[in-house]
Every structure is written in C-alpha cells, then in structure tokens.
C-alpha cells in the first residue's frame, strides 16, 4: 500500500549569510523516509556536510528492500553511513574545522513511525496539534536541564546553547 506523505519545509537563515539546512524525502513500496540535516555554521562546508548526509541516507533507503525488516537498525545504519561519508568529505577537503551537521530522521512504514536524531535537530511527536514528546538534544544545555541546573525557559538564552556534544562528522558520533 502506498504511503502518502504530506510535509512542509520552513527554513530560516537567521543572522547568517547562507542557509545550511537540507531536507530530503523519499517514498516507495509502502515506506517513506524524511530527513532534516542542519550543517553546522561554525564549521567549514556545513552545507556540503548536510547535502552529503542526505544523499547517502536517501540512496540507502532507495536500495533497501521494503518493507524494511528492522526499521531501527536501518536508521542506525543510515546515520552511521552518513557520518562516515561526512568524515570522508572532511578528510578530502583537508580543512582545519571539519564539515559537520546535525540530523533528524524519520521512517514511516505500515502506519508506524521510527525516528532518530543526532545533535540538536529535533523530532516532535504531535497528536491533534499538541506536542506529545520530542527528542532530547545532544547538547550542553540539554544536559544542564536534565541535571536540574537550569530550567527549560533558560535554555534559549544560555551562553552555551549552540554547543552540540554529538554530530554527524564529529568525533564520538
């Protein structure tokens, strides 16, 4: 049964000169993959990191037999392959600050959804317009929140709000 996917993309440049966000959607054989990657602005070639990661994950999805036998395993594999491709990109470019990106990925199949993320790109689970759950950032301020050192309303203004502890292309991802 075909999967009908309705999605909207809103991407704001903010105070930067370029937008390093990338969105990719693929569907076929009753499954769909939705990917959002955000190239890290302080790093060289963040947009290329996001493009590379999206391309690798879409190619893997298109080549995989559907329905996917192990959806969570597929997400793990897709993120791992994207990470390896972005690390290889950084090696080829030979720049001091390697290309990096954060990622949110969602797989829909048989009326079920599985998701994963790396960094501070989030997945929100909505029901009737209300947020039921969201992924927790791999960031310093998220850790402070979990420890009870800051409140959620203090996260946005915290001086370390942009410090990501895990990302595609980074060490330890």
Predicted features along the sequence, with ranges:
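PP2C/PPM-type serine/threonine phosphatase catalytic domain
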Residues: 1-173
């Amino acid at each position: 049964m075909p999967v009908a996917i309705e999605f909207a993309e809103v991407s704001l440049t903010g105070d930067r000169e370029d937008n390093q966000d990338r969105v990719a959607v693929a569907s076929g054989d009753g499954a769909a993959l939705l990917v959002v990657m955000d190239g890290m602005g302080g790093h060289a070639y963040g947009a290329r990191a996001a493009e590379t990661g999206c391309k690798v994950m879409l190619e893997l999805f298109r080549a995989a037999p559907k329905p996917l036998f192990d959806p969570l395993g597929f997400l793990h594999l897709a993120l791992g392959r994207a990470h390896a491709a972005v690390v290889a990109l950084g090696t080829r470019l030979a720049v001091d600050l390697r290309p990096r990106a954060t990622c949110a990925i969602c797989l829909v199949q048989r009326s079920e959804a599985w998701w994963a993320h790396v960094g501070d790109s989030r997945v929100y689970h909505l029901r009737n317009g209300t947020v039921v759950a969201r992924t927790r950032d791999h960031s310093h301020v998220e850790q402070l929140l979990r420890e009870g050192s800051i409140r959620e309303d203090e996260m946005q203004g915290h001086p370390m709000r942009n410090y990501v502890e895990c990302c595609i292309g980074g060490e330890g991802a």
